């Protein structure tokens, strides 16, 4: 008897006739757990049951890099009734490249690949990373909003759909932007260090209030809209710059005024908050020339990607006082960030935690699975970044 870790659902009518409960059973074999099966956490080997291959139809299969437990046990159980999810749980890229061919040979092929959170040890997601899954791989989904570590052009050229998460981490990231804004305004980095050192309010002067200040949002996608909605509570005046202007109704909803150029936003904003994806167009978007346009003693908030901002130019502006404070959740060369940001009292620092909440993670993983389900059912995911039905090699997503 050959063991298998593939799971199939016994039809209800067959289970009823046999007097058995309706459970998920392995194909033509006895029940077993597998280190590569997401279901191994949820099913126990209660009895040995033999099934004929003719009684069940094969289901489409997805491979997940590490266990997608954040999606929730009940959700995964429900998803697994219709589709097969296998897991390859390895610590780094080297092990992935070593183990993937064996996994595909044993349990493949796989037409979908699920990439969860915490991707640093595995990046980049390119031809080498996916090679052993070809030619069957047709979809890659990521639980992250940003996708600069994914070679989307290569995927498009190879007729592979790519999906990031559209809205899962948006509100959590917006919360981080608001937190950094308030922390910068209230100079909490200095305040906390002083309090921990036992210097209670020593040398402190009144901080800045948000009321009446102008907040300029660069990138009015899902994150930018959440920022605008939340910022209005603090009586901030909202302006925004976007590749495409919002509908008038949306501008009314978010109480946001459109700036037709980036320069017009920078010149008039007291606080500049960045929420754009990282791509060729946005890399270095805020450099020395853009910072020169900003109001004196302004505040810069970045929850997008580190490379959107020229860090050397930012440091120079902080030291000169051109920029009064910065609130940063993202950096170049993470986690080895510039030592200046670790020590400067002029910077509020967070270790890229914007989307790291339990609710955001659950939503992100489920959004991945919904894209997989849509692809398995219809041949197209719900929210692709690229379009493999159009000209190859050109991702369709740019600025929001």
From Swiss-Prot:
GO molecular function terms noted in the UniProt entry: glyoxylate reductase (NADPH) activity; hydroxypyruvate reductase [NAD(P)H] activity; NAD binding
Catalytic residue list: 305, 334, 352 (proton donor)
Classification via PROSITE patterns: D_2_HYDROXYACID_DH_1, D_2_HYDROXYACID_DH_3
EC number(s) from the headed UniProt entry: 1.-.-.-
Record's protein name: Dehydrogenase efuE
Pfam families: 2-Hacid_dh, 2-Hacid_dh_C
Pathway entry: Secondary metabolite biosynthesis; terpenoid biosynthesis
InterPro entries: D-isomer_2-hydroxyacid_DH, D-isomer_2_OHA_DH_cat_dom, D-isomer_DH_CS, D-isomer_DH_CS1, D-isomer_DH_NAD-bd, NAD(P)-bd_dom_sf
Gene that produces this protein: efuE
Protein function: Dehydrogenase; part of the gene cluster that mediates the biosynthesis of enfumafungin, a glycosylated fernene-type triterpenoid with potent antifungal activity, mediated by its interaction with beta-1,3-glucan synthase and the fungal cell wall. The pathway begins with the terpene cyclase-glycosyl transferase fusion protein that most likely uses 2,3-oxidosqualene as substrate and catalyzes glycosylation immediately after cyclization.
Keyword Transit peptide attributed: no
Keywords of this entry: NAD, Oxidoreductase
Any one Gene Ontology cellular component term annotated for this protein: cytosol
Protein family (similarity comment): Belongs to the D-isomer specific 2-hydroxyacid dehydrogenase family.
Gene Ontology terms describing biological process: terpenoid biosynthetic process
Superkingdom per UniProt: Eukaryota
Entry binding sites for NAD(+): 222-223, 303-305, 329, 352-355
Coiled-coil stretches: none
